[in-house]
Design a protein with these regions (language model features):
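C-terminal edge-of-domain segments
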Residues: 141-152
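Non-catalytic nucleic-acid substrate-recognition regions in nucleic-acid-modifying enzymes
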Residues: 2-137
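P-loop NTP-binding catalytic core
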Residues: 150-166
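Single conserved hydrophobic/aromatic residue that forms the stacking wall/gate
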Residues: 167-178
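Beta-hairpin (beta-strand-turn-beta-strand) motif
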Residues: 99-101, 146, 155-157
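Conserved proline-anchored active-site loop of SAM-dependent methyltransferases
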Residues: 38, 42, 143, 174-175
Length: 178
């Protein structure tokens, strides 16, 4: 049996039901619709299919951990407990983005540095290296603090799905002939 991953697909408000339909069509399990996002579970094939087929999602995020954190130590420990060495190579570049709403840890830049520090220490320990050059592939890490609950995500989409286009036009098209 394949590994079951939990994914979150954020979307614009009002498009949740459409996204729910798209996710069901992919064969995802345990679908939960909330304001501005749809959470679901599936294997690696569902992650790939979601990135290729979802039209109303902004991106597909892999949920790595959910835990309570009211102090920077709890934020660090929860992030350090994720097996980052299994997810990221030693030379990975991993920018951190985050948000905080109604939490005791309200300073996003401070939380970003704590999350980055936890990942760096875990990668150095897991890969048994002294430095991390961060000159390899880009892995976007995100965190969300909501009412003292932290969710850590790994972005599987790269550029936002809603910004991707199959046709790139270098010049504007003309509606009338010259």
């Amino acid at each position: 049996m394949s590994t079951l991953y939990t994914m979150v697909a954020p979307c614009f408000f009002g498009t949740e039901s459409t996204l729910n339909f798209e996710v069901k069509r992919l064969g995802a399990q345990n679908i939960q619709v909330t304001d501005g996002r749809v959470a679901f579970q599936g294997g690696a094939d569902v992650i790939a299919a979601a990135n290729l087929n979802l039209r109303t999602a902004e991106r597909v995020l892999l949920l790595l951990a959910t835990y309570k954190a009211t102090t920077f130590d709890e934020l660090f420990d929860g992030c350090y407990n994720i097996a980052w060495e299994d997810l990221l190579p030693a030379n990975a570049a991993f920018p951190i983005k985050g948000s905080s709403l109604s939490s005791q840890l309200s300073s996003v830049p401070a939380c970003q540095s704590i999350v980055k520090k936890a990942i760096v220490k875990r990668l150095m320990h897991g890969h048994k290296v002294g430095t991390l050059p961060e000159d390899g592939a880009l892995y976007k890490v995100r965190f969300a603090l909501r009412k003292d609950t932290v969710e850590i995500y790994l972005d599987t989409s790269g550029d936002g799905l809603h910004k991707l286009s199959l046709i790139h036009i270098s010049e504007p098209t003309r509606r009338t002939p010259i």
